[in-house]
């Protein structure tokens, strides 16, 4: 008799996963398509089936029958009838409304007239519509993006079939000289090209830049690439020159340091959000050329002002690249509406099993505050408590012990508070890179790390995003942005470039019985969803880590 499955599906749309069950890995991978992890204690993980998760799954080609079948296949007990009905009804809402284009402009259509009437009567939708036409309602020319946002809020996400401007033609070919696209990268490009807009979710280190380059080659058009910072812009430039037929003269950088507009222009999010006299000073880059494709790197970090700008770019093809759709500001639905639905998602452990990213062992090392620190902590307000606990001087000695256990590993020590990082830099005799470090100096230090002349770097949040340090195999995290799941994923991602079968090590140092420990649990949720387990160690048990990674 076969063992009952690892899932318990509950009538409130939560799903419990028994972590120790032999089929837990397969069930977790199946759940990622349409559910979100809410809690991840040691033995039972709790997922929630959300509307946005179901709509993303539907946009990626999954049906209600397939999703219910997945739950049935892995469940210990029958799936509640109400949950199955709810899934069918929620999936059925996606695409009931469509946005199309006729000779006069944009039209909102539906075969379900009551739905059309319901949305037409919404006070927030009314200003976006111009009046009835045969089979639908005329959409105001500028309102395509804003209408999609409002329809998601009403629970009727529209399928956008209005097409895209081709942009100015630009011949771009992949130059596969000594390398070739991995199967999952090719699949991601195919899914994006078929749809014309949307988000590709791949683990850190899995080659999202190559997916972007291949999407550019598939569209053969002028392209605007939006990235997190100048270092990332230069890495994109180097990759495009190495992987495509593009030349130096065809790629421009639009950032704080440079203002070039070329057929392929790489701009930073920061420059787009600069204001002068209450106006965005650099919006001209969005209309500088007839862009046929806009690539949003690290789309989960898209600043709120750029959402408004993106709402006006709905006629352009849009590709979002990210390791996680998690946004700490809760604006996942805006990514869905304005960039597009999730088109492709490759689970981290699946890519690891194929050998394309390194395996990683994760540790949480708990330290005790001394008595004076505990008294100061007890007398402090909530926000100051995290700073006190996260930047405890006790962490410096613990970091030194971790590094002593990994004497030859290329190491990143990552934190949030600059005074703490200054102390660590001095204690470890290692260079410090922060947001204040000039870009030219950062690049010199990153290159020294790649070449092995610097083995340890102490870095602030600047290393969270799009920094190519393929040899890093040890990261020690001492503080972060409170309970940020996306930051945890980005930091682990610094270690996941393939290492010839060697396992990377990711340590988080936390102060026991404080909000630092509570936030650490929250930060780990996304990686638990991807199948990573944290080994909990006391600071005096650090030798155990050697046995785990050996």
Predicted feature descriptions by range:
Residues 293, 300-363, 527:
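Post-DEXD/H (motif II) to motif III coupling segment of the RecA-like Helicase ATP-binding lobe
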Residues 377-416, 422-423:
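Conserved interdomain hinge at the start of the Helicase C-terminal
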Residues 230-257:
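Conserved helix-turn-beta segment of the N-terminal RecA-like "Helicase ATP-binding" lobe
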Residues 458, 465-480, 505-508:
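A short beta-strand element within the Helicase C-terminal
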Residues 250-253, 258-259, 412, 419-423, ...:
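Conserved helicase ATPase core of P-loop NTP-dependent helicases/translocases
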Residues 202, 325, 482-506, 523:
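Conserved SF2 helicase motif VI
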Residues 1-167:
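Extended alpha-helical interface modules used as scaffolds for assembling large macromolecular complexes
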Residues 195-216:
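Walker A/P-loop
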